[in-house]
Amino acid sequence: MLVIGLTGSIGMGKSTTARLFSEAGVPVYDADATVHAIYEGEAAFLVEAAFPGTTVNGKVDREKLSAKVVHDAAAMKRLEQIVHPLLYDYRQAFLQQAERSGAAVAVIDVPLLFETGGERSVDAVVVVTTTPEIQRERILARGNMTSEKLKAIQARQLPDAEKRKRADFVVDTSHGVDAVRTQIREILAAAAKMPRRRS
Protein backbone atom coordinates (compact mmCIF):
# COMPACT_ATOMS: atom_id res chain seq x y z
CA MET A 1 0.00 0.00 0.00
CA LEU A 2 1.29 3.44 -0.92
CA VAL A 3 1.01 6.07 1.80
CA ILE A 4 0.58 9.69 0.72
CA GLY A 5 1.22 12.53 3.14
CA LEU A 6 -1.14 15.43 2.48
CA THR A 7 -0.12 18.83 3.80
CA GLY A 8 -0.42 22.53 3.16
CA SER A 9 -0.34 25.83 4.94
CA ILE A 10 -3.42 27.34 6.57
CA GLY A 11 -6.14 28.43 4.14
CA MET A 12 -4.78 26.50 1.17
CA GLY A 13 -7.72 24.09 0.78
CA LYS A 14 -6.23 21.00 2.38
CA SER A 15 -9.46 19.92 4.08
CA THR A 16 -11.37 20.10 0.80
CA THR A 17 -8.59 18.17 -0.95
CA ALA A 18 -8.68 15.49 1.77
CA ARG A 19 -12.45 15.19 1.37
CA LEU A 20 -12.04 14.76 -2.40
CA PHE A 21 -9.43 12.01 -1.90
CA SER A 22 -11.98 10.30 0.36
CA GLU A 23 -14.72 10.73 -2.26
CA ALA A 24 -12.34 9.05 -4.74
CA GLY A 25 -12.38 5.97 -2.50
CA VAL A 26 -9.05 6.57 -0.74
CA PRO A 27 -8.95 6.05 3.04
CA VAL A 28 -7.94 9.35 4.69
CA TYR A 29 -6.52 9.82 8.18
CA ASP A 30 -7.24 13.31 9.55
CA ALA A 31 -4.69 14.36 12.18
CA ASP A 32 -6.71 17.44 13.17
CA ALA A 33 -9.87 15.38 13.76
CA THR A 34 -7.83 12.93 15.82
CA VAL A 35 -6.48 15.79 17.96
CA HIS A 36 -10.06 16.94 18.58
CA ALA A 37 -11.03 13.40 19.60
CA ILE A 38 -8.12 12.84 21.99
CA TYR A 39 -8.69 16.28 23.54
CA GLU A 40 -12.10 14.94 24.54
CA GLY A 41 -10.62 11.65 25.73
CA GLU A 42 -7.26 10.25 26.72
CA ALA A 43 -5.20 13.45 26.28
CA ALA A 44 -7.38 15.62 28.53
CA PHE A 45 -5.89 14.39 31.83
CA LEU A 46 -2.33 14.68 30.51
CA VAL A 47 -2.94 18.17 29.11
CA GLU A 48 -4.53 19.34 32.37
CA ALA A 49 -1.56 18.01 34.35
CA ALA A 50 0.89 19.92 32.12
CA PHE A 51 -1.27 23.03 31.67
CA PRO A 52 -3.56 23.49 34.70
CA GLY A 53 -6.88 25.18 34.00
CA THR A 54 -7.10 24.11 30.35
CA THR A 55 -9.86 21.53 30.69
CA VAL A 56 -13.58 21.85 31.36
CA ASN A 57 -15.69 18.82 32.33
CA GLY A 58 -12.85 16.45 31.44
CA LYS A 59 -12.31 17.89 27.96
CA VAL A 60 -9.56 20.20 26.71
CA ASP A 61 -10.77 23.76 26.16
CA ARG A 62 -8.88 24.58 22.96
CA GLU A 63 -9.06 28.35 23.47
CA LYS A 64 -7.63 28.13 27.00
CA LEU A 65 -4.91 25.75 25.85
CA SER A 66 -4.07 27.93 22.86
CA ALA A 67 -3.68 30.95 25.14
CA LYS A 68 -1.08 29.04 27.17
CA VAL A 69 1.01 27.66 24.30
CA VAL A 70 0.62 29.88 21.23
CA HIS A 71 3.44 32.30 22.14
CA ASP A 72 5.56 29.94 24.23
CA ALA A 73 7.82 27.60 22.24
CA ALA A 74 8.72 25.49 25.30
CA ALA A 75 5.03 25.04 26.19
CA MET A 76 4.23 24.11 22.58
CA LYS A 77 7.03 21.53 22.66
CA ARG A 78 5.60 20.09 25.91
CA LEU A 79 2.16 19.85 24.32
CA GLU A 80 3.59 18.12 21.25
CA GLN A 81 5.34 15.58 23.51
CA ILE A 82 1.92 14.71 24.94
CA VAL A 83 -0.05 14.68 21.70
CA HIS A 84 2.34 13.24 19.09
CA PRO A 85 2.72 9.74 20.61
CA LEU A 86 -1.08 9.42 20.79
CA LEU A 87 -1.43 10.62 17.20
CA TYR A 88 1.21 8.12 16.08
CA ASP A 89 -0.74 5.24 17.63
CA TYR A 90 -3.97 6.33 15.92
CA ARG A 91 -2.21 6.80 12.58
CA GLN A 92 -0.61 3.36 12.77
CA ALA A 93 -3.98 1.76 13.59
CA PHE A 94 -5.53 3.62 10.63
CA LEU A 95 -2.80 2.42 8.24
CA GLN A 96 -3.10 -1.17 9.44
CA GLN A 97 -6.87 -1.06 8.93
CA ALA A 98 -6.48 0.48 5.46
CA GLU A 99 -3.99 -2.21 4.48
CA ARG A 100 -6.24 -5.00 5.84
CA SER A 101 -9.13 -3.58 3.82
CA GLY A 102 -7.07 -3.96 0.63
CA ALA A 103 -6.54 -0.26 -0.08
CA ALA A 104 -3.87 0.39 -2.71
CA VAL A 105 -3.34 3.94 -1.43
CA ALA A 106 -4.00 5.70 1.87
CA VAL A 107 -3.69 9.39 2.69
CA ILE A 108 -2.56 10.86 5.98
CA ASP A 109 -3.65 14.48 6.30
CA VAL A 110 -1.10 16.19 8.56
CA PRO A 111 -0.88 20.00 8.65
CA LEU A 112 2.68 20.03 10.03
CA LEU A 113 4.02 17.07 8.02
CA PHE A 114 7.38 18.65 7.12
CA GLU A 115 7.70 20.55 10.37
CA THR A 116 7.50 17.31 12.39
CA GLY A 117 9.64 15.17 10.05
CA GLY A 118 6.56 13.19 9.00
CA GLU A 119 7.59 13.14 5.35
CA ARG A 120 9.98 10.28 6.23
CA SER A 121 7.02 8.07 7.16
CA VAL A 122 5.21 8.38 3.81
CA ASP A 123 5.91 7.26 0.24
CA ALA A 124 4.87 10.52 -1.44
CA VAL A 125 3.98 14.04 -0.35
CA VAL A 126 1.13 16.11 -1.78
CA VAL A 127 1.23 19.82 -0.96
CA VAL A 128 -1.96 21.85 -1.34
CA THR A 129 -1.54 25.45 -2.47
CA THR A 130 -3.43 28.47 -3.78
CA THR A 131 -2.75 32.12 -4.48
CA PRO A 132 -1.89 34.40 -1.53
CA GLU A 133 -5.09 36.38 -2.21
CA ILE A 134 -7.35 33.33 -2.04
CA GLN A 135 -5.48 32.04 1.01
CA ARG A 136 -5.98 35.33 2.86
CA GLU A 137 -9.68 35.46 1.89
CA ARG A 138 -10.24 31.91 3.21
CA ILE A 139 -8.41 32.58 6.46
CA LEU A 140 -10.25 35.79 7.19
CA ALA A 141 -13.58 34.07 6.50
CA ARG A 142 -12.97 31.88 9.56
CA GLY A 143 -14.88 33.41 12.43
CA ASN A 144 -12.34 32.53 15.11
CA MET A 145 -9.20 33.82 13.40
CA THR A 146 -7.36 36.90 14.62
CA SER A 147 -4.29 38.41 13.00
CA GLU A 148 -2.28 37.56 16.14
CA LYS A 149 -3.40 33.93 16.04
CA LEU A 150 -2.68 33.75 12.31
CA LYS A 151 0.86 35.07 12.77
CA ALA A 152 1.51 32.47 15.47
CA ILE A 153 0.22 29.66 13.22
CA GLN A 154 2.25 30.86 10.23
CA ALA A 155 5.39 31.12 12.38
CA ARG A 156 5.14 27.36 13.03
CA GLN A 157 4.59 26.45 9.37
CA LEU A 158 7.16 26.22 6.61
CA PRO A 159 6.53 28.79 3.87
CA ASP A 160 4.35 27.55 1.02
CA ALA A 161 7.18 27.92 -1.52
CA GLU A 162 9.43 25.65 0.54
CA LYS A 163 6.67 23.05 0.92
CA ARG A 164 6.05 23.05 -2.84
CA LYS A 165 9.78 22.52 -3.50
CA ARG A 166 9.81 19.47 -1.25
CA ALA A 167 6.58 17.95 -2.61
CA ASP A 168 6.21 15.03 -4.98
CA PHE A 169 2.89 16.48 -6.14
CA VAL A 170 1.26 19.90 -5.81
CA VAL A 171 -2.52 20.42 -5.83
CA ASP A 172 -3.56 23.96 -6.79
CA THR A 173 -6.98 24.74 -5.32
CA SER A 174 -7.27 28.16 -7.01
CA HIS A 175 -9.48 26.91 -9.85
CA GLY A 176 -12.28 25.14 -8.00
CA VAL A 177 -13.30 21.67 -6.91
CA ASP A 178 -13.51 20.08 -10.38
CA ALA A 179 -9.91 21.09 -11.10
CA VAL A 180 -8.85 19.56 -7.78
CA ARG A 181 -10.68 16.31 -8.62
CA THR A 182 -8.76 16.14 -11.91
CA GLN A 183 -5.45 16.70 -10.11
CA ILE A 184 -6.28 13.96 -7.60
CA ARG A 185 -7.03 11.48 -10.41
CA GLU A 186 -3.66 12.33 -12.00
CA ILE A 187 -1.85 11.94 -8.67
CA LEU A 188 -3.45 8.57 -7.98
CA ALA A 189 -2.50 7.32 -11.45
CA ALA A 190 1.11 8.48 -11.01
CA ALA A 191 1.33 7.24 -7.42
CA ALA A 192 0.36 3.72 -8.50
CA LYS A 193 3.70 3.53 -10.35
CA MET A 194 5.85 4.97 -7.55
CA PRO A 195 8.24 2.90 -5.45
CA ARG A 196 7.59 2.67 -1.72
CA ARG A 197 10.08 4.76 0.26
CA ARG A 198 8.80 4.93 3.84
CA SER A 199 11.50 4.61 6.49
Swiss-Prot record:
Biochemical pathway: Cofactor biosynthesis; coenzyme A biosynthesis; CoA from (R)-pantothenate: step 5/5
InterPro entries the UniProt entry points to: Depp_CoAkinase, P-loop_NTPase
The UniProt record lists the keyword Nucleotide-binding: yes
Domain DPCK: 3-199
Leader peptide range in chain numbering: none
Location within or outside the cell: Cytoplasm
Annotated Gene3D superfamilies: P-loop containing nucleotide triphosphate hydrolases
A GO-annotated cellular component: cytoplasm
Biological process, per Gene Ontology: coenzyme A biosynthetic process
GO molecular function, one term: ATP binding
Superkingdom assignment: Bacteria
Protein EC: 2.7.1.24
Keyword annotations of the record: ATP-binding, Coenzyme A biosynthesis, Cytoplasm, Kinase, Nucleotide-binding, Transferase
Residues at which ATP binds: 11-16
Major site of localization recorded for this protein: cytoplasm
Keyword Zinc carried by entry: no
Reaction(s) catalysed (UniProt annotation): 3'-dephospho-CoA + ATP = ADP + CoA + H(+)
Function: Catalyzes the phosphorylation of the 3'-hydroxyl group of dephosphocoenzyme A to form coenzyme A.
Matching NCBIfam families: dephospho-CoA kinase (TIGR00152)
Family: Belongs to the CoaE family.
Name recorded for this polypeptide: Dephospho-CoA kinase
Biological source species: Nitrobacter winogradskyi (strain ATCC 25391 / DSM 10237 / CIP 104748 / NCIMB 11846 / Nb-255)
